[in-house]
Amino acid sequence: MSDKVLTIPNLLSFLRMALIPVFASLLFYGKYEWALFVFFFAGVSDGIDGFIARRFNQSSSLGTIIDPIADKLLMTTSFIILALPHVLPESNKHFPVPFWVSAAVIGRDVLIIAVALAIFIMTGFRGFQPSIWGKISTVVQILAIGIILIASIIPDYSGWYLPTVYTLVTAMAVFSGVHYIFHVAKLMNEEKSDPENEGN
């Protein structure tokens, strides 16, 4: 893993962060089609930067930090804004996004950061890795935001499926957050049992 800063994956991560205020502004001004386009572009860029990093050996120490930060900022910003009144069309009875959905998404991230920070301070452990359920939860959140934006574009659409989407996002956020605690415990046990770490 290199210490380079100006790699294509890192530039894409920086671009994703730069698009967050653009996305937020489009939502506030009711430009839902453009907001969906920007969000879609940001989501695609997330997949592309990961592919480039692996395929062309451009993984970097900085990238392991800014890539998840960019993702968390985009998700957190999205769910906060979508839960605010008068942002999404008021004609849809399922808008705005319920507060408890946004609270679950943000609470999960706060829990993970708090657990990781506490473990690092107490043990010096650095081998944190995302869990499969965390990745699935992120995918669910991305799809959910896309579905919500599509529902906001179609006029007078009931969006009967939105409560199910909200429930799924919340359930995945809670489950993946709790699962991450056990995931980190497993990683720590594996590091302790690694012969290369004996005596360190």
Residue map of PLM features:
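Alpha-helical transmembrane bundles and membrane-interface segments of multipass inner-membrane proteins
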Residues: 1-200
